[in-house]
């Protein structure tokens, strides 16, 4: 089954981007490259069970097995040793990436309390967009009764756009609800 968002990108979004920014070829039009989900679990240093729960939740949200991230350096103030497991991340590409973005835009973000749109200022100057989610409960896969702790996660949307303006246009046309 072809992905709804991918089809929308190919049939509507890409042609309108080519027209708006006057690209010389179809391949020059910006597209989504990957989406990285990251959950930092700082308290995993004291209680490793917290990390297992975060990994399981991230797996449910993304539909693939997360990679456990480890500390690069020891920091005494945080009681952290080099090599300790302190978080989990997932990199989505291809069909799963489009599925996740579709779900994020149409299901999860509207479930955020007092949601007025995502920030317009979270671009990094290279055409990538970063978004923080305060609680994992906005995702339909997470069962409220099984959650013992509210955790947030970072979502980074990496595009091939050369500028923030192009990336903003790409995401807006894919349905990202930017704040007015």
UniProtKB/Swiss-Prot annotation:
Cleaved signal peptide residues: none
Coiled coil regions, renumbered to chain: none
Keyword Protease: no
HAMAP family attached to this UniProt entry: Ribosomal_uL5_B
Function: This is one of the proteins that bind and probably mediate the attachment of the 5S RNA into the large ribosomal subunit, where it forms part of the central protuberance. In the 70S ribosome it contacts protein S13 of the 30S subunit (bridge B1b), connecting the 2 subunits; this bridge is implicated in subunit movement. Contacts the P site tRNA; the 5S rRNA and some of its associated proteins might help stabilize positioning of ribosome-bound tRNAs.
Similarity annotation: Belongs to the universal ribosomal protein uL5 family.
Protein name: Large ribosomal subunit protein uL5
The organism of origin for this protein: Limosilactobacillus fermentum (strain NBRC 3956 / LMG 18251)
Lineage per the UniProt record: Bacteria, Bacillati, Bacillota, Bacilli, Lactobacillales
